[in-house]
């Protein structure tokens, strides 16, 4: 990647996975992604939000280091924007504490790099990833059904 092309960093801290991605700002090509599932203690059915938030705080710095080391072609000064899932859904009062870890981390990155921060919702991220992963740009509006552990839309 040439020096004049930028990288967008995406951050998502959902109920069970810490996720980071680096995307070519011009082409939209995925350059690197790192994910780590949150550990659930043996015998437990899940994680409390407070425990999950804490695990994200622990995992984000190392995942970011790994993301940067995945591709020596981009360096921090090539970052042109940061995007983060702020809420589970794009509706008023949609809130889960786990997303605060990602928002805090993304704010620090955006401020450190002096770049804009774009906030989105987790559910929209799933839909955008699906359309990007299909290889085809949608030519018109489409109907999508999203089924997840915590939300259906």
Regions found by a protein language model. Give the residues of each.
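Short acidic/glycine-rich loops and adjacent helix/strand connectors
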Residues: 1-153
């Amino acid at each position: 990647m040439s020096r004049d092309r930028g990288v967008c960093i995406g951050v998502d801290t959902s109920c069970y996975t810490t996720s980071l991605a680096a995307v070519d700002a011009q082409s939209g090509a995925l350059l690197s992604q790192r994910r780590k599932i949150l550990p659930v203690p043996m015998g437990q059915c899940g994680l409390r939000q407070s425990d999950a938030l804490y695990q994200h705080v622990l995992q984000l710095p190392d995942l970011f280091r790994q993301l940067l080391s995945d591709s020596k072609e981009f360096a921090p000064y090539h970052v042109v924007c940061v995007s983060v899932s702020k809420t589970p859904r794009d509706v008023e009062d949609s809130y889960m504490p786990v997303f605060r870890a990602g928002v805090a981390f993304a704010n620090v990155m955006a401020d450190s790099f002096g770049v804009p921060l774009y906030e989105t919702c987790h559910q929209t991220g799933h839909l955008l990833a699906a359309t990007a992963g299909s290889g085809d740009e949608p030519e018109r509006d489409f109907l999508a059904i999203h089924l997840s552990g915590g939300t259906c839309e």
